């Protein structure tokens, strides 16, 4: 008779999670590359945020003291900037933490979490992490299809994620579409509007998400300081929802989740309109330029998906594949994001870089297509 030795195993739904693969910054040989794979701000970080960050770091107790667990000053600054109630603002270790909190607070085994195909990769991870069933609704030519999302809602749906603008496609759902989606959802479903790229939009493009979150009990809007504010290294996100939703999220939020220096830098960043405006203008100019350059390569099977973000999704549907272009770009010193893991093996996602980086990328793509 043999005694069975118990084995430590993770929950089955954890084993089903494919590890998140971040954008690379170096080649396989360790050679530094021009990184256009993670949608970072090519202008860096604003002077005000850098000065505030440095001031905290230079304090004698910079490392020995815990940060403010409630991010009180930062929440007040966010509320003042956007006309919100500071008690209904929550800060996170990046907006990723807040997206996970939404799933962990409102869904569990047997529940369903819904999002559009080609949505942000974290949504599936957040769903599986809590044992919920991830459900993908069909897209409409890489854009959000509201009718498909509503058709996928069941009595087990507990959370609906909408990235707007969407990552990795760059597409934007209109205010009318977002309102129609919300109107079609049951009131026991949390509608999460992930606005990581909202600061790149013009006022006319605003999707009305914050207005919904101000007045509706089941809408949670998330934003980040990682993109236009250039604070990606500090991992700072924030969200807004009803008092009841925020109170529930706080029950499982980790204390001390945003660093002291990060909080100070974020407060300063909110007051640096000049840097934000310069970043937005730079992005609009060079996104349009790069899109036009790549659209001129249509005879090579190149197609650019219209973008409202700081990146382009580019389809390679001709003789030279996206995978081939990806590797040839690395050989030329550029790293972009190839997307087979998100079901788009024919596509590359390209961050808008500096002028020199963007011009160089266009030249390298032409060379890659020429073989």
Curated annotation (Swiss-Prot):
SUPFAM superfamilies: PLP-dependent transferases (SSF53383). It comes from the Bacteria. CDD domains: AAT_like. InterPro entries: Aminotransferase_I/II_large (IPR004839), HisP_aminotrans (IPR005861), HistidinolP_aminotransfase (IPR050106), PyrdxlP-dep_Trfase (IPR015424), PyrdxlP-dep_Trfase_major (IPR015421), PyrdxlP-dep_Trfase_small (IPR015422). It is an enzyme of class 2 (transferase). Its EC number is 2.6.1.9. Keywords: Amino-acid biosynthesis, Aminotransferase, Histidine biosynthesis, Pyridoxal phosphate, Transferase. It holds the Pfam family Aminotran_1_2. Its cofactor is pyridoxal 5'-phosphate. The keyword Amino-acid biosynthesis applies. Pathway: Amino-acid biosynthesis; L-histidine biosynthesis; L-histidine from 5-phospho-alpha-D-ribose 1-diphosphate: step 7/9. The modification N6-(pyridoxal phosphate)lysine is found at residue 227. It catalyses: L-histidinol phosphate + 2-oxoglutarate = 3-(imidazol-4-yl)-2-oxopropyl phosphate + L-glutamate. The keyword Translocase does not apply. One of its GO terms (biological process) is L-histidine biosynthetic process. One of its GO terms (molecular function) is pyridoxal phosphate binding. Homodimer. HAMAP family: HisC_aminotrans_2 (MF_01023). Belongs to the class-II pyridoxal-phosphate-dependent aminotransferase family. Histidinol-phosphate aminotransferase subfamily. This is Histidinol-phosphate aminotransferase. The lineage of its organism: Bacteria, Pseudomonadati, Pseudomonadota, Alphaproteobacteria, Sphingomonadales. The gene is hisC.
